[in-house]
From Swiss-Prot:
Family according to the record: Belongs to the RuvA family.
The entry's keywords: Cytoplasm, DNA damage, DNA recombination, DNA repair, DNA-binding
Gene name per UniProt: ruvA
InterPro entries: DNA_helicase_Holl-junc_RuvA_I, Hlx-hairpin-Hlx_DNA-bd_motif, NA-bd_OB-fold, RuvA, RuvA_2-like, RuvA_C, RuvA_C_sf
UniProt keyword DNA-binding, yes or no: yes
Subcellular location as annotated: Cytoplasm
Protein's UniProt name: Holliday junction branch migration complex subunit RuvA
GO cellular component, one term: cytoplasm
Organism: Shewanella frigidimarina (strain NCIMB 400)
General function of this protein: The RuvA-RuvB-RuvC complex processes Holliday junction (HJ) DNA during genetic recombination and DNA repair, while the RuvA-RuvB complex plays an important role in the rescue of blocked DNA replication forks via replication fork reversal (RFR). RuvA specifically binds to HJ cruciform DNA, conferring on it an open structure. The RuvB hexamer acts as an ATP-dependent pump, pulling dsDNA into and through the RuvAB complex. HJ branch migration allows RuvC to scan DNA until it finds its consensus sequence, where it cleaves and resolves the cruciform DNA.
């Protein structure tokens, strides 16, 4: 099993990235919470990984921290939650925000995420409450565990920021009208794709 990958970030199109490791390009699906932390293209990055084998595909999921990966693994063990929905949940809120929802029985916030109905939200709260205790203990005082080159600079804003943001939201399961409306409302001149996606997601919670 591949536990982590370190290499050069050669492609970024939320929620997918490609990491070049010694000449081999690994395609990974990453939650937006991890995507926001990634460097610009052609910079060094490291991601903790989870490997999923299906009948029709073999997929790699990448995470900035072990804690995010641990939460992803807990989510996919919940009845009715697969990797795609787990990725959507982690893209819509941070790990700490999710933990807070579970602790407060905040069904109303969880159902705002695409693909999460009332029954799924209730099941998440019930099944995840005890499982999260170990995650919280592991997360206490933890630091970000990814390495970037010392000359790292944030990715520059691009003209297609709105298109990239809408595409990312569609990939996460949001409806076209909802994605377009939230991106348009959140957009400000000079915004990068990452910043715009983050603002659009926040506006829907």
């Amino acid at each position: 099993m591949i536990g982590r990958l370190s290499g050069i970030l050669v492609e970024k199109q939320a929620p997918e990235v490609v990491l070049d490791v010694n000449g081999v390009g690994y395609e990974l699906q990453v939650p937006m919470t991890s995507f926001y932390e990634l460097p610009a293209l052609n910079q060094a990055a490291m991601l903790f990984t989870h490997f999923v084998v299906r009948e029709d595909a073999q997929l790699l999921y990448g995470f900035i921290t072990k804690q995010e990966r641990a939460l992803f693994r807990l989510l996919i063990k919940t009845n009715g939650v697969g990797p795609k929905l787990a990725l959507t949940i982690l893209s819509g809120m941070t790990a700490s925000e999710f933990v807070s929802c579970v602790e407060r029985d905040d069904i109303a916030t969880l159902v705002k995420l695409p693909g999460v109905g009332k029954k799924t939200a209730e099941r998440l709260v019930i099944e995840m409450r005890d499982k999260l205790k170990s995650l919280l203990e592991a997360s206490a005082g933890s630091e970000r565990e990814f390495m970037l080159q010392s000359n790292y600079t944030p990715a520059a804003a691009v003209d297609s920021a709105e298109e990239d943001a809408i595409s990312a939201l569609l990939s996460l399961g949001y409806k076209p009208a909802q994605a377009s409306k939230s991106v348009s409302a959140a957009f400000k001149e000079g915004m990068s794709s990452e910043t715009l996606i983050k603002a659009a997601l926040k506006s829907m919670l």
